[in-house]
Amino acid sequence: MISVATLECFTHGKIGIKIHKMACGYKELQNDFGYDIIRGNVLVTASMFLPSKESIESLLNMKLPKSDHEFKYSKAYNEENDLKVAEYISKALKEKLKCNIAISTTAGVGKGAISILTDKNSYLFTSDIYGNLIKGENILKRQENAVNKAFEAFIKILNEEYNIKE
């Protein structure tokens, strides 16, 4: 079994929850893309929604860079720093939970960032949608795009790195 952990911000835990539901065999999803690849091959050890910088630092025993923007209780970086922070988080998550695959997401101003760290490789990419957390622009469109893009990348990784086919 391939173990997966997610620590998500702008995707609100939706990536991990989707993987978990498929891994558990939810019948409502049995016709969805990726179901047969995940079911019986993947287990989710943790799926977290953590917008708070302090909570992430405390849980993963790490220090994140200062936010680029002030935004209520949440961290908010520009796209360049989102990419760095997503990668930091996935590395710390993988180390802390000893999982095969760690997925993290974070987005402030820009397209956001998705990091998928496997036993062999590191994948770092953005959504296709510009959003601005501070101004509330395109937040849900960016989120939906990122969830879909990350899930598709996850399935491709299972195919190519772990040789799991439908």
Swiss-Prot record:
- Pfam families assigned: HcgF (PF06787)
Report the domain of life of the source organism. Archaea
Q: Which InterPro entries match?
A: HcgF
Say which family it is in.
Belongs to the UPF0254 family.
- The protein, known as: UPF0254 protein Mevan_0254
Which species is listed as the source? Answer: Methanococcus vannielii (strain ATCC 35089 / DSM 1224 / JCM 13029 / OCM 148 / SB)
